[in-house]
């Protein structure tokens, strides 16, 4: 899976508060483009959209696939993780999504440490309302809980996560940061 190095401390002082994101009208990556590559251009493509989102009071954008605008992809700098009502951990699969070591690590933790079922598959936007939890994952924050998604005025609120991290998201966060901080034994080869 790659190397994970010890963190010096928590990213959020006092805990992570759920964020509110909006469905973007912009596209982050073109079909068959370079969305899966960590390149400056991919971040630059989302700058106008994030400035617009912040001006409208949102923390981040949700990008849908550029070809059909029906499938969840990612934000400008983080991958999505969803939790179903029966505690299955789901993450979107697309050739336009930047592969994330944090996402892979969280999926490994979910399956091998927490005993949860995991799926990497296409996630259709229409099914997002049925998930119990939503989070954004990336290197700095590990997981930022999403409490609400605004789709052009229609709100999707996650029953677990409006006031704090949902229970599965919290277990994922605590377990991965426990591994990073040396409180929980790491898988072979994760920590040097």
Positions of predicted regions on the chain:
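Short, small-residue-biased leader/transition segments that mark boundaries at the very start
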Residues: 1-5
């Amino acid at each position: 899976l790659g190397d994970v190095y010890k963190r010096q401390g928590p990213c959020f002082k006092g805990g992570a508060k759920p964020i509110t994101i909006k469905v973007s009208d912009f596209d982050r990556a073109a079909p068959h483009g370079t969305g899966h590559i960590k390149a400056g251009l991919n971040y630059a493509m989302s700058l106008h959209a994030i400035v617009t989102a912040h001006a409208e009071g949102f923390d981040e954008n949700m990008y849908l696939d550029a070809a059909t605008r029906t499938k969840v992809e990612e934000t400008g700098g983080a991958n999505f993780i969803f939790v179903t009502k029966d505690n299955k951990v789901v993450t979107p699969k697309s050739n336009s999504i930047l592969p994330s070591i944090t996402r892979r690590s969280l999926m490994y933790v979910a399956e091998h440490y927490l005993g949860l079922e995991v799926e990497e598959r296409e996630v259709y936007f229409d099914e997002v309302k049925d998930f119990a939890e939503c989070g954004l994952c990336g290197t700095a924050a590990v997981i930022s809980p999403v409490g609400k998604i605004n789709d052009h005025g229609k709100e999707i609120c996650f029953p677990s996560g409006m006031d704090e991290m949902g229970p599965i998201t919290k277990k994922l966060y605590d377990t991965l940061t426990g591994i990073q901080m040396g409180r929980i034994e790491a898988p072979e080869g994760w920590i040097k």
